Amino acid sequence: MLWIMRFSGLFSAALVIIVLSPSLQSFPPAEAIRSSHLDAYLRFPSSDPPPHRFSFRKAPVFRNAADCAAADIDSGVCNPSLVHVAITLDFEYLRGSIAAVHSILKHSSCPESVFFHFLVSETDLESLIRSTFPELKLKVYYFDPEIVRTLISTSVRQALEQPLNYARNYLADLLEPCVRRVIYLDSDLIVVDDIAKLWMTKLGSKTIGAPEYCHANFTKYFTPAFWSDERFSGAFSGRKPCYFNTGVMVMDLERWRRVGYTEVIEKWMEIQKSDRIYELGSLPPFLLVFAGEVAPIEHRWNQHGLGGDNVRGSCRDLHPGPVSLLHWSGSGKPWFRLDSRRPCPLDTLWAPYDLYGHYSR
């Protein structure tokens, strides 16, 4: 188990070390970025893919511990002993996605029992991920950006408008029906604990599980027009909605399919196009549908907001306490800051998982 505390002096850079600490507090909320129509989802574009623009080192081979179930090399996606993880892949965040996968394998007691589902809108990424992780259990799914392009409205940040951010809305349709549960993870995080612990989250009657932050100012995620119109604000009637970050979720896909939550989210996106009820991209529709109906997960599984602000160069600190997942949500990403030689102290925790071949340490 990893416990992390940061110490800093007035004129010196912060030193990040691993220590024991009794409690965990969380950062203020930050928008999660990255993150029946099945034929459309799986239709690959006809244009020739562009050449690879990246070079990654081959990851070490990680084997199951002795007490794991016997790993079946030829086992398919429907093997009930598998832990399913879904992550998006695109060129801008590819380095982060590969670091996330590397971190999961490194800290998993049964890495050969983890199956990765990669969502892509660019088709030339599968060979790259397979060459980096030759023994990884994986499947790549093409997500057609046109599925959501007409539903996306302008946001406060252009990055929040990317169609692939909305692919998580369609996981229940994209993944095979035999996959009944999945962990969805953003591309700007690392896992420093056994992913199987997150997988075992008890959802009860809930469709998704995530760390909740009930101290956050929930009203700011929606416009005054939303709160002043009972047709919209009435969505939270009978609920006690709390903010949650959609970059780390355990999802019951079987229940999702049964209720038809993809269509419910799409309806809210259509309302947004005509009535402008929120500003923050793909997050508010999830809040509208699930806030107040989320199975709580320990905050250690999403220490989010570490990205800070690239424009102002602000850095965030970890609060004392146990940490199982570090999430660089926000506009600043560790690989950009490391390359510019202006890293934040916590970026050094991400660096060991970076497999990018052109980065020298």
UniProtKB/Swiss-Prot annotation:
Documented EC number(s): 2.4.1.-
Topology within the bilayer: Single-pass type II membrane protein
Record flagged with keyword Transmembrane: yes
Subcellular location: Golgi apparatus membrane
Lumenal side: 22-361
Membrane spanning residue stretches: 1-21
A molecular function GO annotation: polygalacturonate 4-alpha-galacturonosyltransferase activity
One Pfam family named in its UniProt record: Glyco_transf_8
Coarse class of the protein's main subcellular location: Golgi
Keyword Transmembrane: yes
Class of this enzyme: transferase
Keywords noted in UniProt: Cell wall biogenesis/degradation, Glycoprotein, Glycosyltransferase, Golgi apparatus, Membrane, Signal-anchor, Transferase, Transmembrane, Transmembrane helix
Any one cellular-component term (Gene Ontology): Golgi membrane
Role played: May be involved in pectin and/or xylans biosynthesis in cell walls.
Record-given protein name: Probable galacturonosyltransferase-like 7
Organism: Arabidopsis thaliana (Mouse-ear cress)
